[in-house]
């Protein structure tokens, strides 16, 4: 079988060969590389698309607690390019067929899955079975059931699991969390968040293919807006009502283009989100009893910007969000620091996404949510 890539993944699945052929490699059990005796953890990037190429790999040149140790790619031409650029030894380069052999490699402590959404669960589970800690890029999966499977696999293997929520580590977001946690502006009454961009590129890109992406704007950018309303209110929502809009059906053939949703929170606060692959949007706003605060931009790669009703400008030195994120996860593994973006957070957000889709399918009816408390400010439960 040819090496698996984003380009031939659909073909394999259509022939009924995808998961069966990929999983034909016998899983190997080995002792987990804990990294406890290392100064830095070795990270292997699984999938060398634009995010790995332009964000993660450069960030790993500046991280303090981890480094780029290996790669997994289905494109042979990329192997030499990456090996030469980042001095990656041949023994640390894998494809999707021999991926399970990574279990034997003590150079690699963490596997970062950066594949199309529908492939997250499979490779996170395989990484856990190989005894490697796991970072799963957002969204965690394409269903709540897949989230559960990933969490269970990591728990059984005794490995750590984190979700690639870069904003949870960056200072502007953490300042918003502080405002809410310390009641700087009193009780939160309203929060809104927008996250989107205009997609006008290749109509065959995997994000526009539901078989690969699992959804459209909601699973891609919408998770940022959902997270903003949660840490902006300090609570998980108790209900959601949602609507979908399509103005370019010829382009967005089987994925959602634009979605709006309204949340209710336990303390009486309300929230609104808008997410789109057709509208440029990048902000969050919180109104409280004695004032307001906002970030705009709020969810791009930075630098971000913010201000408050007191006239204060929210400003921090710019650092790579990906660098901060991967260092935070590495500190969790190495020093048992809090896991600020655990698998449970990824699952929570997938439950909310599923409820949004359910509301849309029911013509905008309210859908009640029964979420476990916590994960409102980060990995440390709030209640």
Predicted regions and their residues:
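Predominantly a Rossmann-like dinucleotide-binding segment in NAD(P)-dependent oxidoreductases
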Residues: 167-252, 363
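C-terminal helical cap and adjacent loop that interface with cofactors, partners, or active-site loops
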Residues: 16, 312-383
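C-terminal segment of N-terminal export signals and the immediately downstream linker at the start
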Residues: 24-62
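Rossmann-fold dehydrogenase core element
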Residues: 149-166, 189
């Amino acid at each position: 079988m040819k090496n698996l890539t984003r380009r031939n993944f659909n073909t394999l699945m259509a022939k009924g060969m995808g998961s069966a052929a990929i999983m034909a490699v016998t899983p190997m059990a080995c002792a987990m590389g804990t990294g406890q005796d290392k100064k830095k953890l070795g990270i292997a990037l699984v999938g060398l698309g634009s995010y790995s190429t332009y964000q993660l790999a450069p960030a790993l040149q500046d991280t303090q607690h981890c480094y780029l140790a290996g790669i997994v790619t289905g494109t042979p031409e990329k192997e030499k390019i990456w090996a030469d650029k980042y001095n990656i030894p041949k023994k640390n380069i894998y494809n999707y067929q021999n991926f399970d052999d990574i279990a034997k490699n003590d150079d690699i402590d963490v596997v970062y899955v950066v594949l199309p959404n529908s492939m997250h669960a499979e490779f996170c589970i395989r990484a856990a079975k190989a005894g490697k800690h796991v970072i799963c890029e957002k969204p965690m999966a394409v269903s709540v059931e897949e989230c559960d499977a990933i969490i269970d696999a990591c728990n059984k293997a005794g490995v750590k699991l984190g979700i690639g929520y870069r904003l949870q580590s960056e200072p502007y977001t953490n300042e918003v969390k502080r405002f809410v946690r310390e009641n700087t502006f009193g009780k939160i009454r309203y929060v809104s968040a927008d996250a989107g961009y205009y997609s006008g590129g290749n109509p065959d890109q995997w994000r526009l293919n539901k078989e690969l992406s699992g959804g459209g704007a909601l699973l891609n950018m919408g998770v940022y807006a959902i997270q903003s309303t949660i840490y902006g209110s300090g609570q998980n929502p108790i209900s959601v009502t949602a609507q979908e809009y399509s103005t370019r059906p010829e382009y967005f053939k089987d994925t959602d283009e634009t979605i709006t949703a309204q949340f209710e929170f336990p303390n009486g606060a309300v929230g609104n989100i808008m997410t789109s692959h057709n509208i440029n949007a990048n902000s969050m706003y919180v109104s409280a009893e004695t004032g307001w605060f906002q970030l705009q931009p709020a969810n791009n790669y930075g630098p971000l910007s913010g201000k408050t009703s007191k006239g204060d400008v929210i400003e921090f030195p710019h650092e790579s969000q990906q660098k901060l994120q991967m260092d935070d996860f590495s500190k969790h593994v190495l020093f048992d620091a809090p896991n600020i973006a655990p698998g449970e957070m990824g699952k929570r957000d997938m439950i909310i996404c599923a409820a949004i889709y359910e509301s849309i399918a029911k013509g905008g009816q309210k859908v009640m949510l029964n979420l476990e408390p916590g994960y409102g400010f980060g990995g440390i439960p709030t209640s």
